[in-house]
A protein has these predicted regions:
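RNA pseudouridine synthases
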Residues: 1-138
Length: 138
């Protein structure tokens, strides 16, 4: 799987890499479902490969121009809210995805700008490897 996301801001320029892999540990926040929280001791491992594709301007539905960071995510695990946490949590990028109502802020009319760009799987009947690709419209 590959995902494209727009992060609601720009990463600090110092020591920023263009790509890498992060491992974060999260568990359900039982007092604030469905929110997930960092827990290095009891959390489940979430491994995500990422690449910064660039910084650009995004015009939201209110007409406000925002500086955003376009990121490619390739999750190696399938944890709940894995990519949203890789973006928003301070152990990840520390910048939420545009429109994320759980881990960031959402301005009127915004939607979550996270898109599955590529999904591959083995067909259950033919056994053929299938790959579906669709570029993000944002």
């Amino acid at each position: 799987k590959e995902y494209i996301a727009l992060l609601d801001g720009v990463l600090p320029r110092k020591n920023i890499q263009k790509h890498g892999t992060m491992e974060l540990f999260f568990r359900l926040d039982v007092d604030n479902r469905p929110h997930q929280i960092w827990d290095e001791k009891n959390g489940k491992s979430a491994i995500t490969e990422w690449e910064i594709l660039g910084v650009e301007k995004y015009k939201n539905p209110q007409g406000t121009l925002k500086n955003v960071t376009r990121v490619l995510f390739k999750p190696h695990t399938g944890r709940t809210h894995q990519l949203r946490l890789a973006s928003a949590d301070s152990h990840g990028f520390g910048i939420p995805i545009v429109g994320d109502t759980l881990y960031g802020k959402c301005e009127a009319g915004e939607r979550l700008l996270l898109h599955a760009r590529k999904v591959s799987f083995v067909h259950p009947v033919t056994g053929e490897r299938m790959s579906i690709e669709c570029e993000a419209e944002f």
